[in-house]
A protein has these predicted regions:
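A short, N-terminal "cap"/entry segment at the start of jelly-roll beta-barrel domains
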Residues: 1-36, 118-138
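A short hydrophobic beta-strand segment most commonly corresponding to one strand
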Residues: 60, 87, 101-120
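Short acidic-glycine-tyrosine-enriched beta hairpin
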Residues: 74-91
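Conserved short histidine dyad/triad with adjacent acidic residue
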Residues: 25-27, 40-55
Length: 138
């Protein structure tokens, strides 16, 4: 058994190369072979967001607190809130982050390929895309 103590975990500010605004991350687990699981709590200040990116094995987001946004390339922005789960299929270009006026945190879970490939990063999300009216919540 391995217990990863929270007191040994460091909060990291995420780089401007892949994020807009102030974004923090706490890595919860980085699996060792044969596991390929990676999980992090990511906290976004209002307006903070990822750049467009994709994951070869997909990604799952579990919303912990606040209000956020997520968008798949070519689809309408979706509002997401605490308790929501977002399942992102493999190789789907997307972004996620906080609403313009709310803090937002989620647990981000993904796996690497057996070759160690993880996140593929693309361009930053434009303010026009980010500020688009979200789809109605159903």
């Amino acid at each position: 058994m391995t217990v990863l103590r929270s007191s040994n975990r460091q909060t990291k500010v995420q780089p401007a190369t892949n994020f807009t605004g102030v974004v923090f991350s706490d890595e919860i687990v980085q699996g060792s072979a044969p596991s390929r699981m990676r999980a992090s709590v990511v906290s976004f200040t209002p307006g903070g967001r990822t750049a467009w990116h994709s994951h070869p094995v997909g990604q799952t987001l579990y919303c912990l607190s606040g209000a956020g946004r997520v968008q798949f390339d070519g689809q309408q922005v979706q509002e997401i809130r605490a308790g929501d789960t977002v399942i992102i299929p493999p190789n789907t270009r997307h972004w996620h982050g906080a609403a313009p006026d709310k803090l937002f945190s989620h647990l981000a879970m993904s796996e690497q390929t057996d070759k160690g490939e993880g996140t593929a990063w693309f361009e930053h999300v434009s303010d026009t895309d980010y500020n688009a009216k979200p789809a109605p919540v159903t």
